[in-house]
Amino acid sequence: MYSSSVCIKIHLERLRYNLRILRSRYPNVMPVIKANAYGHGIRVVANVLRDEGVQHMAVGSITEGFLLRQEGHQAFLLALLGPFSEEDARIAVVHNITPVIHNIESLQSIVHYSRVHQGGTAVPVAIKIDTGMGRLGFSSNDYISLIDLLRHTPEVNPILLLSHLVAPEISSLDNVTHNQVEQFARAYKAIKEAFPTIKTSLTNSPGLLAWPNYIGDFSRPGIALYGGNPFYGTSRVSLGKGFLPVMEVEAPVVAINTVSAGSSIGYGCTYYAKEDIRVAVIGAGYADGYSRSFSNKGWVVIKGKRYRIVGRVCMQMLMVDITNSHSKISIGDKAFLLGGGGSLAIKPEELAEWWGTIPHEVCCSLGSSIGAQQKQLVII
């Protein structure tokens, strides 16, 4: 097992703060804690949500839901990916995890288990329709056939109708969002006649914040809960301000070198010193989820000041130019890859921009090895 020198800090008070902001916009939230809570640790995050009185949570897989049931969580759990197998169906039914049914195959797996093991008892399920994502869901254009199918399938009890917005954060695609909302509304109106108590869920983080009139019974916020701005890089960026990054990532300075003018740094000779410089070697690299894409363009924070990465990010190391440091930097000092405190703290959105991705991937990548590698996890 790889033992990393990287330390991941999870700030629980920031998580609580972000949750309270979201609830102030709409009380009925179903926080998304899939993918190990976006890399933050599903157990830790679920415990905070429970302590804050959250009664509905959305996990990715049924296995994630089972993990929480083993931990004693009693909240309503929605498994967004639905059942993949008969074993998934069994776990969902036995442990009261509500599966998302998004195609005939996922429906059949639940029906089969109910008939064989439950005497045909109706299993509570969520029905997903595709209104434009092109990913999971029954076609919203064929909801009449869907309703007929569900009416003739007494082994399931549809309790939730959901879909997923494609681009609620992008104002130039508002027509797409409006179209999705209209499709969802038409389908819901028809399905509600057959299943009068069915609830709805449509919006994610940007949907909740930018489209408050179309939330439905539950909103499913994700990245905003963890402090990411879902509108970063769009004209609506101000709508996502105020959330606090929950994750901080730090690694130690493991060496300090003087590099002579004209000398190269790192693999491939991608950086040459124009003058004599001082370089700090940081004990973190792409093995820790810190992308090689940050080579020669990323920054770290040491003692409240930013320092630029020089040369390529290595497997377990990266190098930064500390020539212009106004404070003494020593071996063992902390370098923040994410966070760092103060106005110069590195935000998830900045890492995403340097990487050419989104904050979601940043958090998932940096936190992905929690539990698999020996990263130090500090709960604050």
From Swiss-Prot:
Its cofactor is pyridoxal 5'-phosphate. One of its GO terms (molecular function) is alanine racemase activity. Transmembrane segments: none annotated. One of its GO terms (cellular component) is cytosol. It catalyses: L-alanine = D-alanine. Pathway: Amino-acid biosynthesis; D-alanine biosynthesis; D-alanine from L-alanine: step 1/1. The active site is at K34 (proton acceptor), Y267 (proton acceptor). This is Alanine racemase. The gene is alr.
